[in-house]
């Protein structure tokens, strides 16, 4: 579960390395915590030099991995080792061209099909 002030890793090659959650936009209503598939507003805390995204820039991101266990529709429980997000634009398309690490199938149902197609492994 991601809440404001949570630090996240970036799971794409957009140029940012670490994010800090500022606000949970989510998918429905006024949510306090973000789960897999929810959209957040975040600030870049660490970035790769000479890239378009810079430190202290405010961006939108979608959560792709959380340390808190996540129960799938078929009953399988998935838990990751880190909290990670993919940086997106206003239309929901990823800013990077590659996605690192495993991604859950539920992102496809939430209309993040472009992120799922870039992922090397879908659980």
Curated annotation (Swiss-Prot):
GO terms for molecular function: large ribosomal subunit rRNA binding; structural constituent of ribosome. The keyword rRNA-binding applies. It is found in: Plastid, Chloroplast. Keywords: Chloroplast, Plastid, Ribonucleoprotein, Ribosomal protein, RNA-binding, rRNA-binding. The keyword RNA-binding applies. Disulfide bonds: none annotated. One of its GO terms (cellular component) is chloroplast. It comes from the Eukaryota. GO terms for biological process: translation. Part of the 50S ribosomal subunit. Belongs to the universal ribosomal protein uL14 family. HAMAP family: Ribosomal_uL14. Binds to 23S rRNA. This is Large ribosomal subunit protein uL14c. It comes from Brachypodium distachyon (Purple false brome). The lineage of its organism: Eukaryota, Viridiplantae, Streptophyta, Embryophyta, Tracheophyta.
């Amino acid at each position: 579960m991601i809440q404001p002030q949570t630090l996240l890793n970036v799971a794409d090659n957009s140029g940012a390395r670490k994010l800090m959650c500022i606000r949970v936009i989510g998918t429905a209503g006024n949510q306090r915590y973000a789960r897999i598939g929810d959209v957040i507003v975040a600030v870049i805390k660490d970035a790769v030099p000479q890239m378009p995204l810079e430190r202290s820039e405010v961006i939108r991101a979608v959560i792709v991995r959380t340390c808190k266990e996540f129960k799938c529709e078929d009953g399988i429980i998935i838990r990751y080792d880190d909290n990670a997000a993919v940086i997106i634009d206003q239309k929901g398309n990823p800013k990077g061209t590659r996605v690192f690490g495993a991604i859950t199938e539920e992102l496809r149902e939430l209309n993040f099909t472009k992120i799922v197609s870039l992922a090397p492994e879908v659980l």
